[in-house]
Amino acid sequence: MTIKLIVGLANPGAEYAATRHNAGAWFVDLLAERLRAPLREEAKFFGYTSRVTLGGEDVRLLVPTTFMNLSGKAVAAMASFFRINPDEILVAHDELDLPPGVAKFKLGGGHGGHNGLKDIISKLGNNPNFHRLRIGIGHPGDKNKVVGFVLGKPPVSEQKLIDEAIDEAARCTEMWFTDGLTKATNRLHAFKAQ
């Protein structure tokens, strides 16, 4: 099994670029930069895309330009065009249930109320069996404050922790292709930014 599509979830536009909900896109942007593969807008895939080589494999990068709750449209368009199965997709997203400075790989599961994941599961024919990179952003402590929290910008101290976790996640994702998922997961799950 190999990953053929890496997606970073986000809301489009400058006003959302620095918000917690865009952590997935920060990850894909960093990966594109590390691999010297600038993302370019591609209308037929409803997002910014790039092609990279990881561990000798052709991998597509995607940051949808749809709003978060329509992310599945972009993912399904690309998966269908390149004949990519759900278990060959890695979706990077912000995760309320992990603190800033932590990131974890996961295969399958529910959407945990995340509208981007919810739409992807739906557009992949109700198939939740894709890989996720959960990027910790912390929780506001009150479920009624979640929307404002994810659409808010993290303070500098938290941003630093999130950035460090994303940096480690990018290294571990590259490692996944050379050394396998188990090694990459063990390394990423042992990491906590200070």
From Swiss-Prot:
Query: Gene3D superfamilies given for it?
Result: Peptidyl-tRNA hydrolase (3.40.50.1470)
Q: Set out the biological process GO terms recorded for this chain's protein.
A: protein quality control for misfolded or incompletely synthesized proteins; rescue of stalled ribosome
Q: What is its main location?
A: cytoplasm
What's its EC? 3.1.1.29
Q: Which domain of life is it from?
A: Bacteria
Active site, per annotation: 21 (proton acceptor)
Per UniProt, what does mutating residue 11 to A do? Complements a deletion, kcat/Km for charged tRNA(Lys) is 0.8% of wild-type. Diacetyl-Lys-tRNA(Lys) hydrolysis reduced 275-fold, no change in hydrolysis rate of un-acetylated Lys-tRNA(Lys)
PROSITE patterns for this protein: PEPT_TRNA_HYDROL_1 (PS01195), PEPT_TRNA_HYDROL_2 (PS01196)
Single Gene Ontology MF annotation: peptidyl-tRNA hydrolase activity
PANTHER family linked to this entry: PEPTIDYL-TRNA HYDROLASE (PTHR17224:SF1)
The family note in this entry says: Belongs to the PTH family.
Protein name (database record): Peptidyl-tRNA hydrolase
